[in-house]
A protein has these predicted regions:
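Helix-turn-helix repeat elements of alpha-solenoid scaffolds
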Residues: 28-44, 68-85, 113-124, 154-164, ...
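Amphipathic alpha-helical segments of tetratricopeptide repeats
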Residues: 44-45, 82-90, 123-130, 163-174, ...
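Residue signature of alpha-solenoid helical repeat architecture, marking inter-repeat boundaries
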Residues: 52-55, 96, 136, 176, ...
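Residue register of alpha-helical TPR repeats
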Residues: 58-59, 100, 140, 180, ...
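Structural motif corresponding to the intra-repeat A-B loop/turn of tetratricopeptide repeats
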Residues: 72, 112, 132, 152, ...
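Short coil/linker segments at helix-helix boundaries
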Residues: 275-315, 392-406
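Bacterial C-terminal helix-turn-helix
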Residues: 495-555
Length: 555
């Protein structure tokens, strides 16, 4: 916070020492973080007195913005100091001072997730590039603009600015500053589906920064390694990398928002580990049920892994709670939205569909506030998955039609939102979600679902066998089932029945039709029997054969 004394003297007379400004610039360029932070604390009175009538104050404010980005103070400090430089009085500033003020304004906009506004500030700075001798600030402007574009999911656009920022840093003989920019370059390579190239780029930056105390950037490197490991299905390695990132971030600030991001990443990995474990438990349970049909006296064993599954879920929720506390401090909409989305998938996995639906809607509203296409797209994908689950489970009477329709609407909106970005993987996920939603009712959606599959495959190249790939396989499996049904009906319409008797054909037809009518009739056996004029006993038998009713259920 700006001290009360400084507030009384916003026009503090005197001059900001050029040596002090040069030291701040050099400490940033050489990533001497602790030294720079200490220097600012020693000169706190000078910082707090920063005002329009103080020579060099605007340049100081520009450097302060860079140090706030590193962790010196909250962006609110820059916002308060900017109020001392009203637009109508800036005509007396030099071009360099004006550029630094624009950088400070861009930093504030960036911290408030107003990325379009921030981009405009940085574009003004870059438009004056030829008139500015201080190329370090031009390098930072390119870098920050690239960061904004990356947050918007415009990876290809971002890469050009990041490359220019790094090139300028190298020309200025600032290899450590260039390495910081290289980390973002590696992250973009990862998002573009180049994990090996990303790891190589990150490794080069890691080597340069290893002897510095730039713990935030070092943490970002570990975090990026964690995401690469997660994408490749190496969940234990991913947890280790995220743990290392948390350790690095904690050396600088226990409430760093990057720290919150790592907590969310760990929670999501533990969710994926939980899904793996649950699938293993389900396989063991199915194997035992099959064995028990041959030995009626065998009691059902206590399956191993249930306690571990419970523990993984509890730990995931604990990590999300920590992340949410940090994001609340910054009012970070994207961060809070990602927390809610991860909550949503944990609720969905556990069958708590009402809570999953609620947090999905909350995440979407956060994205709507900031016009965040990525967050809105992710939220709609979650909401689509919830409606698909409602349809499959038929938890509300007469809900099948509305759930399938809502699922398709959410998925189509997701596709629309994410197509405003260059996030190929997220676009693929949206197409998979739409394909799965269309599979809920095959009356007119088979070809559209097949097109969704083709689109997803195109955007997922090169393929990696992670959870998104498994979702794609699930979509393909459902489409194969639809193809089998359609081909069977087509053959029957042409009189091709092979050696099947009419009774056998009737039974197979009933097995196709009855489950669909049962869903449309709110999962009520009596309604199906009345509508089709058949025995309720036959309806129950067919539903049980397909695993839609247990032995104790009557529908």
């Amino acid at each position: 916070m700006v001290s009360p004394t400084a507030e009384q003297i916003p026009g503090h007379k005197g001059k900001v020492p050029e040596r002090f400004l040069r030291q701040l610039q050099e400490d940033i360029a050489w990533r001497r973080i602790a030294r720079g932070l200490q220097r600012l604390q020693v000169q706190r009175t000078l910082v707090d007195s920063c005002g329009l009538r103080q020579k060099g104050a605007a340049v100081l404010l520009g450097y302060l913005a860079q140090w706030v980005d590193i962790g010196f103070a909250r962006p609110a400090l820059i916002k308060q100091l900017l109020a001392r430089f009203p637009s109508k009085e800036r005509e007396t500033l030099s071009l360099l001072e004006y550029v630094h003020l624009r950088m400070a304004e861009g930093l504030v906009a960036m911290s408030e997730e107003e990325f379009g506004k921030a981009i405009r500030h940085f574009e003004i700075v870059l438009a004056l590039e030829d008139e500015i001798r201080d190329k370090q600030v031009i390098s930072i402007a390119n870098f920050w603009l690239g960061r904004c574009l990356r947050r918007q999911g415009r990876y290809g656009d971002a890469l050009g600015y990041v490359a220019k920022a790094k090139g300028l840093a190298i020309q200025l003989n600032y290899p450590k500053m260039a390495a910081v920019m290289q980390v973002l370059e590696g992250w973009i390579a990862f998002q573009e589906g180049q994990p090996e190239g990303a790891a190589r780029i990150l490794g080069e930056a890691e080597e340069v920064l290893a002897e510095t105390d730039d713990y935030v950037t070092r943490g970002n490197i570990s975090s990026a390694y964690g995401r690469i490991a997660r994408r490749q299905g190496n969940y234990d390695q991913a947890l280790s990398r995220f743990g290392k990132a948390i350790e690095e971030y904690g050396k600088r600030d226990p409430f760093n928002r990057y720290l919150a991001r790592s907590f969310v990443n760990i929670a999501f990995v533990k969710r994926l580990l939980g899904l793996q474990l649950r699938n293993k438990i389900d396989v063991e349970a199915a194997r035992f049920r099959k064995k028990r049909t041959r030995t009626a006296t065998t009691s059902f064993p206590k399956l191993q892994g249930r306690e571990q599954l419970k523990r993984l879920r509890e730990e995931a929720f604990e990590h999300l709670t920590k992340a949410r506390e940090i994001y609340d401090r910054y009012d970070d909409h994207r961060g809070k939205g990602n927390v809610y989305i991860t909550y949503g998938y944990l609720y969905l996995d556990n069958g708590d569909l009402d809570r999953a639906s609620s947090v999905g809607a909350t995440a979407f509203s956060l994205g709507e506030e900031k016009k965040d296409s990525i967050l809105k797209g992710r939220s709609r994908i979650l909401q689509c998955a919830v409606e698909c689950a409602k349809f499959e489970e038929q938890i509300e009477e007469g809900s099948s039609g509305s759930s399938s329709q809502l699922a398709c609407e959410y998925a189509r909106e997701a596709v629309e939102f994410v197509r405003q970005t260059q996030n190929r993987r997220l676009i693929a996920k949206a197409h998979i979600a739409l394909g799965l939603a269309l599979c809920l009712d095959f009356s007119d959606g088979v070809e559209a679902a097949r097109q969704c599959t083709d689109d997803a495959i195109a955007f997922l190249q090169p393929l990696s066998h992670d959870y998104v790939w498994r979702e794609l396989q699930e979509l393909k499996r459902k489409l194969r089932g639809a193809g089998n049904i359609n081909s069977t009906l087509r053959e029957w319409s042409q009189g091709i029945v092979g050696s099947k008797s009419f009774q056998r054909v009737s039974e197979e037809f009933a097995a196709i039709v009855i489950p669909k009518v049962w869903r449309r009739e709110g999962c009520k056996v009596a309604r199906v029997a009345a509508r089709l004029s058949i025995s309720p006993k036959k309806v129950r038998r067919i539903l049980r054969n397909q695993g839609l009713l247990t032995g104790s259920e009557n529908g």
